[in-house]
Swiss-Prot record:
It comes from Arabidopsis thaliana (Mouse-ear cress). Keywords: Antimicrobial, Disulfide bond, Fungicide, Plant defense, Secreted, Signal. This is Defensin-like protein 164. GO terms for biological process: defense response to fungus; killing of cells of another organism. Belongs to the DEFL family. The keyword Oxidoreductase does not apply. It is found in: Secreted. GO terms for cellular component: extracellular region. It comes from the Eukaryota. It holds the Pfam family SLR1-BP.
């Protein structure tokens, strides 16, 4: 009976510690910025400009090919 109780307590401690680590993990914030290019927006030049300006490891771009405005999303 004592072995069963110790095993149960060990499993509960393991699950609780995993939950605490998961809940306290820092989440990445995503920021959005508008980049004005001198030519119609294309994804490649938007990504290059976003990486150059914000120096981040993650970036996505949106925009249309008729507008000179591109929307850049990056990790803050």
């Amino acid at each position: 009976m004592a072995k069963l109780l110790c095993s149960y307590l060990f499993i509960c401690m393991f699950v609780l510690s995993g939950f605490l680590v998961f809940s306290s993990a820092k989440q990445l914030k995503t920021c959005t910025s508008v980049i004005k290019l001198g030519h119609p927006c294309d994804i490649e030049s938007c990504l290059n400009e976003c990486f150059r300006v914000y120096n981040t490891g993650f970036a996505t771009c949106r925009g249309d090919k008729y507008s000179q405005l591109c929307t850049c999303e990056y990790n803050c």
